[in-house]
Amino acid sequence: MRAMILAAGLGTRMRPLTLDTPKPLLKIADQPMIEHHILRLKAAGFTHLVINHAWLGEQIEAHLGDGQRLGVEIVYSAEQEPLETAGGIAKALPMLSPDGQTPFAVINGDIYCDYPFAQLPLTLEAPKMAHLVLVDNPAHNPAGDFALQAGSVVDDSDESEVISALTFSGISVLSPALFDGIHSGEKAALAPLLRAAISEGKVSGEHHSGYWVDVGTPERLTEVDQFVREQNGV
């Protein structure tokens, strides 16, 4: 299975740190954020990676190159301007799923998480079109995004049968079919596609209760940096 790291955001919430440096190259414990993902994906057996980029993307390519230094193969999907999540994935589909049928993993580049990527399902059983990893709600998203019911992701259901609403972690396995109708180079958000599939019972999920942070602000970057340094005994 191939994996995509989403790295095309402008990083506006992270300014001024991202005025001259793309967010994926901001450092956590002296290592670029994106390298943490790459090394953990490699350890889980993902060695063919696709990275999209837009803002200062040439710096990402210059730093990571073809991935050989990190023991992986990296190809890039350059966007002249950010295409949003679904648009970026749709543009990269030929690299992610050459046969147009095999699912692939997608990881948001601006999260830090101890989720074991080797736990991701390598296949999606029909009629499933997506598998989402959900996490406990952070302070900045107290209402959550979705809920879980018997292994399926749902929007709304009877409270007695549903685990409390959880937050989408930005970690998923997706089917190319989810992007039918999205043309290469078209801007498109992922949430509407997921909600449509959820309404048809086509999305499975799991709850990861470990460490997870949306590293979207300088404050959260500092928080994660301190956490990782403590974990590493630095």
Regions from the PLM with identified roles:
Residues 42, 96-103, 114-149:
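Basic phosphate/pyrophosphate-binding loop/patch that engages nucleotide-derived ligands
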